[in-house]
Amino acid sequence: MKTYNINKRINTLLLLVITMLSFSGCDLEPQEKFRFDPEVDPQFTFGSMTTWEWLQTNPNDEFGFMIEAIKQTGLQDMYNSKTETYTFFLMKDPNWTNNGPGFFSREFNLKNTADRDPKEVFEDPAVDLDIVRNYLLYLTLPIYVDQGPDHLKTLDLPYTFETLSEDVNNQIMTIARDWNYVMQINDSPDLPTGNLGKINVPVGYHNYIFSNGNSVAHIFGLNNNGKMARRYKFGEPKMDF
């Protein structure tokens, strides 16, 4: 008899606990998926400092070739603007110098530039500064695009943007973002294959905000090799897409 009463009490207690959990569970809101929130998510804000000023004060000295490219092409004012709206894609030194996928190797067949002085490399007769200039303009959008949903509303869908490039074959860039809001450049089946084959690059670092919020910069990831972010060599005759 005692055993029966004990079991009955245990069963009653378990039923009560289950009932309480069921009702409390109704009040629980579903866990929210990852959502980009510019007020919370990591961003790097530099006040009135411009992109040009920041590049020259970078403590790791990673942008020697980027700085020299801007100087050689006379684009300092663009990178130094406090009032115009731009999105810049920046490249660290290995993106310029890696043999094979690096800029000098792909555009000019210029190898082994990593240990050379940037000024000396840009003054090499093999380097066409018009091509360098258009490449920097290609990596510049005349609007503000961060990794949030304002321009990139749907996951894994490439959105098309017009760059500032004057090269007839290299004026369009596509940008997509994955579930974690990592931006991917030119990974779109709609882009022509081009004479460099399928080339795309992930963004390694996002949302460096300059010029009182008028400009934003993103830095290409190295991804073992610095891949270029478009598929046609610069300076060639117009291609029929």
From Swiss-Prot:
Membrane topology reported for the UniProt record: Lipid-anchor
Signal peptide, first to last residue: 1-25
Regulation: induction: By ulvan and rhamnose.
Cell compartments where the protein resides: Cell outer membrane
Chief localization: membrane
Residues anchoring lipid (N-palmitoyl cysteine): C26
Alphabetized UniProt keyword annotations: Cell outer membrane, Lipoprotein, Membrane, Palmitate, Signal
Any one annotated GO CC term: cell outer membrane
Transmembrane segment boundaries: none
Residues lipid-modified (S-diacylglycerol cysteine): C26
Function, as annotated: May be involved in ulvan degradation. Ulvan is the main polysaccharide component of the Ulvales (green seaweed) cell wall. It is composed of disaccharide building blocks comprising 3-sulfated rhamnose (Rha3S) linked to D-glucuronic acid (GlcA), L-iduronic acid (IduA), or D-xylose (Xyl).
Protein name: Uncharacterized protein P37
